Design a protein with these regions (language model features):
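Sec-dependent N-terminal signal peptides
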Residues: 5-17
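N-terminal secretory signal peptides that target proteins for export/translocation
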Residues: 1-3
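Small beta-barrel nucleic-acid-binding modules, primarily SNase/OB-fold domains
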Residues: 9, 19-189
């Protein structure tokens, strides 16, 4: 009995070490699903343009209007088009998974305690329509938590298709997230 009592702390320590060494801590589940959004970190010191924002109007899965400082947009409203992806339509002509993608985006941003918008370069760039800025959307889900990249989450959960994914700063990880969504047959796939 005394030997068992002495072994218990050792066994407990080994069990805890094995649990923390498992994929869950590294952002990988037992079935091999990788949380790429947990792996990608917001670098506030990089040369890309960044600004804090709050949601003004949620439009759909890949378009949101944000309130931003007037130094970013003269009227204080940045009409954002998410970089690297295209979600199915949820307004006008409703497409399969469009409403689900829209709800996913709305839910993540509504519960965020902080939102940072990031350009893919050192200045804000317009999309092909000329009416929206192309952005990476980072949100902090709770106080003290790391920021998560919403664009990447939409891709890894199968709510979006790739759109000019390889032509941006996070192209490689976006491609990996999209491949995984296909492998796991998530939503659109």
């Amino acid at each position: 009995m005394k030997t068992l009592r002495n072994l218990f702390p050792l066994l407990l320590t080994l069990t805890l070490l094995l649990c923390t060494a498992s994929g869950a801590v590294a952002g990988t589940t037992d079935d091999g699903f990788v949380d790429y959004a947990a792996q990608l970190q917001l670098n506030m010191s990089s040369a890309t343009a960044k600004t804090s924002a709050t949601v003004r109007t949620h439009v759909d899965g890949d378009t949101v209007h944000f309130d931003v400082p007037e130094s970013v947009c003269a009227d204080g409203v940045l009409k954002a088009r998410f970089l690297a992806l295209n979600t199915p339509e949820s307004t006008g002509k409703i497409e399969e998974y469009g409403v689900a993608a829209s709800h996913f985006t709305q839910e993540k941003l509504a519960s965020a305690v902080s939102i940072i918008l990031e350009s893919d370069s050192d200045r804000w760039e317009l999309d092909s329509t000329g009416g929206r800025m192309l952005v990476w959307v980072w949100y902090q889900p709770s106080e003290g938590a790391e920021y998560r990249n919403l664009n990447l989450e939409l891709l890894q959960n199968g709510y979006a298709r790739a759109y000019s994914t390889a032509n941006n700063q996070y192209g490689s990880i976006c491609s990996s997230a999209l491949d995984q969504a296909r492998q796991f047959k998530l939503n659109l796939y």
